Amino acid sequence: MSAKPIKSILFVCLGNICRSPLAEGVLRAVLTEGGEDRDFVIDSAGTGGWHAGEQPDRRSIAVAAKHGVDISGQRARKVLPEDFPRFDLILGMDEANVRDLKALAPAARDRIHLYLDFATGNVTDVPDPYYDGTEAFASVYRMIRDASEALAKRLDASPSTLDSDQASSTI
């Protein structure tokens, strides 16, 4: 088992306008609130490119802003082949995202995980709130906030390395 330094994290959902931009923004906020001074590269992308160049969904922007997190400057993009060697940790929001990512980059399988499973040990998807109302976005925000706090603690517990075997994801 070899330990890899975790210096870059990519969050991935389907369109990169709801869940993954929230995860990117919330983890940044959690690390800042915790006085985390390590330099991280945190980004987000989608497995699909339908929304490339667009801002996050207005409901994601609103729920983040309600909690003091500004994600309005983010722009959607599709996962690129060069993302796989660039990021130490790639976290999919649901099992379909994880399957798609592993199919795109089989060599990166050990760095691709289901977000909630990796962060909290809870093998659960972050549901896509796109076709739902504001309460669904609020619920997704809470899930992402809790997972981001757990992930920050996990990163802090092992400040320079994280064993890939620590994740229980078997997807």
Predicted regions and their residues:
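Conserved active-site segments centered on acidic
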Residues: 2-86, 153-163, 171
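Helix N-cap/beta->alpha junction signal
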Residues: 20, 94-95
